[in-house]
Amino acid sequence: MKKRTTVLPGLLLAALATLPLQAATVRIVQTNSAGDSVMLIDPATNTVVGEIKEIEVNHGAAVAPDGSRFYITNEAESTLDIADAKTLKITKHIPLTNHPNNIAVSKDGKRVYVAIVGGPGAVDVIDAASMTRAKSIRTEGGIHNVYVTPDGRFVVAGSIIGKKINVIDQAKEEIVWTLATEEGVRPMAFDVNPDGATKRIFAQLSGFNGFVIVDFAKQQVVDKIKLPELPPAERVTQGLQGSPSHGLAIAPDGKTLCVLSKMNTRVYMYSLPELKLLGESKVGHHPDWLTFTPDSKRVYVANAGSNSVSVVDVAGRKEIAQIPVGQVPKRNITAVLP
C-alpha cells in the first residue's frame, strides 16, 4: 500500500491529533538555509531519518495534500524545486519571477503560493497539475512569508520593505485588502472563530521583540504585546537581522500560542484565546521558526545560530532535546504519513 504524506497547518493538524498514534507516522521537515539539504526528523526518536539533497540555500518547505511531492524554495537559483516524497529526489525546477522566501499550498492542493521577496515583490502562483507558473500577483514590497488561512479562503502575504499585510482572495487570486504596519511584516499565525473563519492575525514586526494582533474582520491592529524583557547581559543583540522576535505558531488544539525571541533565546507560551503568558523555555541560539506535533505536546524550534532543532515539552515548558541538523536551519513544517 502506497504511503501518503500530508502537511499539517492549522485545523488539519488539529483533526489529525485525534487519530490513534499507530495510524500515522509523523515527520518534522527542516530546511537548512545556508546548506544544500532539507532534513526529515522522526519525533519518536528525535533523529534525522531522511534528507532531500542538492537544493542550495533552501528556504521554505511545504507538502502536497496528496503526499506525492515536497515543494521547496531554492534561493540560489530562484526556483521552486519539487521533490518526490517517496524517493526524496528532485524531479522539477520551476523558474520564479525573482528571489523566493516561504511557501503555502491551497487546501485542495491545486495551487502553490510562493513569496517573492526580490523587488518589486509578488506572490507567484504555481499550477500544481502542470507544474508551471500560472500568474504573479504584484504586491507593494517584497514578500517574506505567505500563508493560506485555516479556512482556505484567503492567501495572506507579509512584506518587510513594504511594511504591509496583503490579503488575497484565494478563489479570485486578487488582493482584496491591505493593512499598513509600523514596521516590516515577519512571521504570522492565524486564530479562528468557532465556524473556522479567521478571527485574528498574530504578526511579528521588524525591530519589535513581540507581536501585534490584527482583527481580521475590522482589518486593523487592535493590540501589541511585548515579550518579557531580560537584563542587558542576557540579551542577544548581534545577528538578529532586524527581527528580535521571529517565529510563532498556534498549537493544533488551539489552546496555545508559542512565540520565539531571538533576542531572549526563548520560546514563550501564551494561552488562547486569553493571551495570558503561561511560561517560557530556553532554546538554542537565534531561534527562527517552530512547528508543533499533531498532539500539541511538543514544539520543534529551528535554532539558526546553533545549527540545531530544540524539542520543547509544551506543558512542562522545558527543552528536552536538541537535534543537530544542517547549516542555519530556519523554516520547518510537520508532515504525517498515514
Model-assigned labels for residue ranges:
Residues 19-338:
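Predominantly soluble domains enriched in secretory-pathway, periplasmic, or organellar proteins
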Residues 9-20:
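Bacterial N-terminal signal peptides
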Residues 1-11:
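Bacterial N-terminal signal peptides that target proteins for export
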